[in-house]
């Protein structure tokens, strides 16, 4: 399914009240026991994730590493910051890929990713879909932004088209796929990678109810189109 981008209402994450310059933030965060993003002159606390959340990210990093080995591209996990500009905002996506020479020697953060991935959670979904995506869209090298549901086989891929517009392709899988059906293939065009959606959910027990609801919603929207 392909749809035009829609921006949801976005609550702000928990912020640190102290105002800091970008340089002060980068120095301050090095001394903290936890990770903090940065926007609007303030640091904000990063929330933890569930085991399925982490497993999905690990599975994707494994797929990307195997595919990109020897290409000169870097696959980075949730410990790597992305700077929208050298002065921020700064966010920690779950997975990112950069193939840009300017990121080759980066130490504290990258600035030129082609692919950014967020694994959704109840506490961050609105932020990931809203304000954070608006920030990411300012990165001129970004070609794809991907949102993955860790509790059901659902991958939303936003791609920048030739007209400079972001379009959504929604991939939905099911545990009930029969042996004669073709598996749903997720396409990440920014890194020229295609893989079955099931590969993202290896070693994860999914909710059959949520998967069924997603499929019914997708069929309903397809029929309306």
Where in the sequence are the language-model features?
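Gly/Pro/Ser/Thr-rich low-complexity, intrinsically disordered segments predominantly at protein N-termini
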Residues: 1-225
